[in-house]
Amino acid sequence: MIIGRLRSAQGRRWALLLVALVVDLLHSVLVEKRREAAVAQLHWLQSRNACEPLYGRIGIFIYADQLERYEGTIACWKCYADSRGYEQFVVKPFAEDQRCQRRCGHIVSVFFRRHCVAAVYLDRVDWLLFVDADSFPVNFHRCVEEFIDPDYQIIHYERFFSGEVAAGSYLVRNSDQSRDYLLDWAEQSFVLNQINVHNMDNGVLQLHVLRTVGVDHNRLALCWEKFRNASSLVGYFAFVGCTKRSLLEHRTAAGHSRRSVKVLAPLGGWLRDVWLTGGHWTDRDFVLHDLKRQNAFLKRFVSEPNCPSSADTAGWLWSLGPTKLGYKVSVDTASRLLAKAERRSARYHPDVFFPGASSSLVVSQYDEMRGN
């Protein structure tokens, strides 16, 4: 009987210990949830001040060939646009309105046609953010206005791993100069017939930027020759390295006297490829790219009825369920992952990662932005 009482007392002690552990665990979870809610509230309050319409009406333009394939990201962009007061335009290739058909109907390549259609949509807003359908805003507290420079007509950014001026996303002002820039780019699909390795509209864009900013004709001819003779990716990136060096040298010699096109440094823009950090992201990121495989979870939760409330935007997409686990990291962690990606890219593309190139500075710049 005494032994039974002892066992009973021991059992109660274990039960009390277990309850204490559960309470402690729940308390930790509640504290973390409160902290996340406070951070989200802070980001929202900051965004209310940062997203004032300083540059007029902002539009987000998506050209998607398979709307059902990108249902999740398109819905996410709609939530973001509605929360910021931006307009959203989703256009399907070869199903555009009559204005677009009249102006762009002769352009067969979707990669070039999309820039022509974007030019037609320009007159609906003051600034247009062109984005790929497989991209999405991961932090709603970031604003398009952060990246607008009113001294320029077109704003590009350099892609981190390749050194290319990115063709898949750009900011463009509603102006005759911008419209001509996009239409001229769109009309250059014929160039691909002369090139073996061209990367579609990306390769053409590198030369288009150089011509627009007024790079020396001899330098242009040198880069064109590299482009025309490229027979492999090695040759293509030698061409990209040529255009990158030419743009950097032109900036040094001429400054920014011709304020037409601005090219932001890698990670200095609004978008980066999500695979660079293995799917991880931070509060610093704005738009993540290359979400081609959109699972049922994303499609289910990222829809208009489930848009976040105004006080719960930052991190909303990833607080909905298992997708969040292990993906949001500190800026330190992301910087280490980016440094690793940079070393890998430098081995594969030495012509792009040369001394003095902007790519060699971006990881430290990303790390320095943690307080912003």
What are the residue ranges of the model-derived segments?
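N-terminal anchoring/stem segment of glycosyltransferases
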Residues: 2-125, 176, 327-372
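Extracellular/periplasmic catalytic domains that process cell-envelope and extracellular macromolecules
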Residues: 51-55, 122-123, 147-149, 161-165, ...
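Solvent-exposed loop/turn segments at secondary-structure junctions
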Residues: 66-67, 95, 135-137, 160-162, ...
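Short coil/turn segments at secondary-structure boundaries
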Residues: 71-76, 93-94, 142-143, 168-170, ...
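Structural recognition of the beta-strand scaffold that forms the well-ordered cores
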Residues: 89-90, 129-130, 154-157, 169-171, ...
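Catalytic core and acceptor-binding pocket of nucleotide-sugar-dependent glycosyltransferases
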Residues: 115-116, 177-372
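Short beta-strand-to-loop acidic/aromatic patch adjacent to the donor-nucleotide binding site
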Residues: 118, 125-136
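Conserved donor-nucleotide/metal-binding helix-loop-beta segment in metal-dependent transferases, i.e.
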Residues: 135-176
